[in-house]
């Protein structure tokens, strides 16, 4: 009997390679579909999989075919409708629609619906955050000297007794003994069967029985001489030290929850911060996040309170900036940490407080942060806070600001703020 062992990496998912090739080939169309789909999701359903539709025209392969028009001669088999020398009318032209529902009705032509397929959560998030990175991320070189961690790295045939893998060694022993004795055991079984037959036959065949018993004893001795365990079987757990990235990063999320922020505006701010959280947790292994909510007073909160607390009040934006400055001085040394901040507000602030916000950012925060992003969520005209921040944008390269009017603007603005650039790929 012949045995086939499937050692492919994707043995249980044999179409994985084709699927990955398809995702690479039609990445632009898939990303366009994803950017449209994310705006239709609820705030709590941003990170699941997605059904992606692609127009049929975008996935059609080029091919050679007969053009319309012209005169051609063909030979067709006869049937009960046509006989020799009949002239067949040319079918009416007209192509079908792509199935998107956009177009006019027609009695002619045919087409296909859009191609729809499901992508997994991992594929969805990979495409969602592709080409994004934290700007100006740098590594603290003096921390790289001792930044090594031990990781398991499979098995090796050499090692110290303390690292021996008993299970893997016994598996190898069983496999070796089975391979070395399988033929002898089959032969032994055949001889024992033959001896059993001869011993019950008439007349007795004593010489033949004696010969079979000698051969059986020799085979059993050979089988027993195969060692139970051999140095060839031994396997040891292998460990290796790998350098760990020494970059430490912290993201400050500052959200305005004042009375001027209606529920729709707060939902858009939360959607932006959920995208930011997923991006950080998906792209970077260890990034700390500090959540700050503010109205007239600012407070550092946990993740649940940041997204679900109903507390509200007036508006003094500088309270959040002062609290961030205090937390940085207390816990995050700029020489050891890459500090980032993302602030979301509707721009409504006490007029006398906006110049103070400018001063705190210019003198205390922007000199120590790698990147500070501000998004203003409003359909109204910009107020004093936006105008003060415009002066900062003209002065500091690590300050960026964007305007969000509707829910459809969130993802494009997010990509604009965190678009990967060659200058950001620090060594």
UniProtKB/Swiss-Prot annotation:
It holds the Pfam family DUF444. Residues 79-110 are annotated as: Disordered. Residues 92-102 have a biased composition (Gly residues). Residues 79-90 have a biased composition (Basic and acidic residues). Belongs to the UPF0229 family. This is UPF0229 protein YeaH. The gene is yeaH.
């Amino acid at each position: 009997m012949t045995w086939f062992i499937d050692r492919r990496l994707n043995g249980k998912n044999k179409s994985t390679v084709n699927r990955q090739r398809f995702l690479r080939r039609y990445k632009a169309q898939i990303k366009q579909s994803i950017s449209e789909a994310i705006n239709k999701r609820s705030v709590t359903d941003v990170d699941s999989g997605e059904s992606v539709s692609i127009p049929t025209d975008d996935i059609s392969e080029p091919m050679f075919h007969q053009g319309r028009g012209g005169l051609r001669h063909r030979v067709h088999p006869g049937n009960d409708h046509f006989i020799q020398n009949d002239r067949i009318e040319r079918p009416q032209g007209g192509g079908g629609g792509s199935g998107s529902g956009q177009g006019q009705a027609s009695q002619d032509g045919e087409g296909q619906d859009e191609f729809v397929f499901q992508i997994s959560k991992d594929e969805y998030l990979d495409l969602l955050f592709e080409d994004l990175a934290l700007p100006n991320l740098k590594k603290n070189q003096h921390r790289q000297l001792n930044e090594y961690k031990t990781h398991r790295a499979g098995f090796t045939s050499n090692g110290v007794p303390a690292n021996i893998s008993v299970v893997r060694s016994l598996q190898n022993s069983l496999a070796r003994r089975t391979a070395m004795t399988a033929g002898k055991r089959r032969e032994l079984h055949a001889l024992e069967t033959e001896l059993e037959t001869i011993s019950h036959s008439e007349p007795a065949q004593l010489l033949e029985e004696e010969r079979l018993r000698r051969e059986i004893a020799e085979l059993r001795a050979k089988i027993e001489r195969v060692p139970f365990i051999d140095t060839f079987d031994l396997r040891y757990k292998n460990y290796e030290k790998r350098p760990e990235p020494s970059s430490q990063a912290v993201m400050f999320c500052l959200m305005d929850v004042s009375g001027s922020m209606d529920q729709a505006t707060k939902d858009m701010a939360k959607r932006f911060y959920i995208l930011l959280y997923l991006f950080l947790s998906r792209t970077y292994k260890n990034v700390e996040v500090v959540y700050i909510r503010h109205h007239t007073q600012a407070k550092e909160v946990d993740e649940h309170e940041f997204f679900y607390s109903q507390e509200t009040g007036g508006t003094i934006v500088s309270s959040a900036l002062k609290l961030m400055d205090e937390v940085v001085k207390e816990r995050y040394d700029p020489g050891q940490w890459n500090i980032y901040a993302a602030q979301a507000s509707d721009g409504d602030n006490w007029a006398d407080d906006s110049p103070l916000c400018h001063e705190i950012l210019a003198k205390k925060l922007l000199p120590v942060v790698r990147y500070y992003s501000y998004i203003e969520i409003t359909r109204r005209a910009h107020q004093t806070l936006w105008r003060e921040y415009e002066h900062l944008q003209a002065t500091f390269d690590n300050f960026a600001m964007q305007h969000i009017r509707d829910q459809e603007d969130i993802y494009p603005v997010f990509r604009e703020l965190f678009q990967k650039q060659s200058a950001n790929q620090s060594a």
